[in-house]
């Protein structure tokens, strides 16, 4: 059996050109001043609190056997507010998930966006991931909204924009999202600021 040496193995795709990195850096530096990495507008403590809150809600949801078996629910927390997205077999299962989430310590508000229906498959999950990436990339190039100020989540072609924005910024972010191929609906879960 003949083997190839490591030096002859080629990558699956060519690495990005240096011009792409220059463009990426241009957007990051323009959007974030001197920073060399994106900065979440929430404090580090709030980010940790939100991560802990997501775990608490997910734990509460895992206690329900029907939800665990038949539903696909993702939990997103932002400043103590919880967004539930995914699919559940019945409307009562969706309401049950909302009630379980409300029982988690630290929840200030719940947005229940769980849809009634079959769980989505790996193909749709991949498409949703692509949509989220495309929107985030376009937000980096947008001068009206900083990409770090809005969290983008896609579930079954529905895009959820989460963050603390002015009405004009929220509208600009929604317009960016609407113009990405594969987006069926844009839902703003925004804390409005002036």
Swiss-Prot record:
Record-annotated BON domain positions: 49-118, 127-194
Organism: Actinobacillus pleuropneumoniae (Haemophilus pleuropneumoniae)
A GO biological process held by the record: killing of cells of another organism
Subcellular location(s) per record: Periplasm
Protein name: 21 kDa hemolysin
Gene Ontology CC annotations of this record: periplasmic space
Signal sequence interval, chain numbering: 1-19
Gene3D superfamilies assigned: 3.30.1340.30
Alphabetical keyword list: Cytolysis, Hemolysis, Periplasm, Repeat, Signal
Parts of the chain that traverse the membrane: none
Keyword Signal: yes
